[in-house]
C-alpha cells in the first residue's frame, strides 16, 4: 500500500510544484506559499486509491491519450501483480483520440475493460467501434455498462493487482443523451466492498 500512496503523493507533488512556481513567478514569497498550503490535500479523483478484494482500485480523471499513458506507465513501474485498466471515451468529443486511447490502454495494461464514459448524444456502440480500431491485442473485453465494468474489474483482482478506473475521476455522473445519471466510480468501489 505504501507504493501506491507514494504514487498519489507524486501526482500531488507534481501539481504542487507547478503551482508553487507559478505563484512565485507572480511575486509571492516561497516560504509564505509553503506555509499557507501545508495542509492542502489532493483533489478527489486524482490517483485516489482504494484497497479492495486483495488489490487496489485507483480512480483517476485521466481522459486524454497522454494522461492515460502516463497513469498506466506510472503504475506499471510500481506493480507487483497485474495492471487492469477500465477506460472509455466521451461522446460528442474528438473521435480521433478514440483508437489511440484503445491502443494505449490495451498495449500498456495486462488486461483492459473498455467501457462508456459520458456517451452524451452518441451511440455508445459507435464510440466503442472507434476505440476498437486502435486495439491490436486480445487482452481486453468490452462492457458498455460502466457500473458492471467496475464490478468485473474488481472481481478480477488478485493480491497486489492494480485496477485503474480512468476517465471520470471526481465526476459523480454519467451523461447519456442530455441527461446526467448518478454514477460515481469511487462509490461503485465502496458499494462492491459493502456487498462482499
Where are these regions (language model features)?
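Single conserved hydrophobic/aromatic residue that forms the stacking wall/gate
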Residues: 1-14, 112
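ATP-dependent carboxylate-amine ligase
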Residues: 18-31, 35-45, 49-196
Amino acid at each position: 500500500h505504501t507504493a501506491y500512496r507514494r504514487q498519489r503523493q507524486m501526482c500531488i507533488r507534481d501539481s504542487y510544484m507547478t503551482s508553487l512556481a507559478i505563484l512565485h513567478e507572480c511575486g509571492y514569497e516561497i516560504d509564505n506559499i509553503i506555509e499557507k498550503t501545508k495542509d492542502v490535500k489532493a483533489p478527489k479523483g486524482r490517483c485516489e486509491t482504494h484497497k479492495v478484494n486483495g488489490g487496489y482500485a485507483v480512480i483517476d480523471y485521466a481522459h486524454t491519450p497522454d494522461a492515460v499513458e502516463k497513469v498506466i506507465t506510472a503504475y506499471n513501474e510500481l506493480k507487483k501483480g497485474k495492471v487492469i485498466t477500465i477506460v472509455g471515451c466521451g461522446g460528442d468529443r474528438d473521435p480521433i483520440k478514440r483508437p489511440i486511447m484503445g491502443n494505449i490502454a490495451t498495449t500498456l495494461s495486462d488486461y483492459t475493460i473498455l467501457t462508456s464514459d459520458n456517451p452524451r448524444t452518441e451511440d455508445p456502440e459507435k464510440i466503442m467501434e472507434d476505440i476498437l480500431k486502435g486495439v491490436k491485442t486480445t487482452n481486453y473485453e468490452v462492457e458498455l455498462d460502466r457500473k458492471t465494468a467496475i464490478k468485473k474489474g474488481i472481481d478480477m483482482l488478485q493480491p497486489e493487482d492494480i485496477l485503474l478506473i480512468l476517465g471520470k475521476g471526481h465526476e459523480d455522473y454519467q451523461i447519456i443523451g442530455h441527461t446526467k445519471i448518478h454514477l460515481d466510480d469511487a462509490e461503485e468501489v465502496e458499494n462492491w466492498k459493502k456487498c462482499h
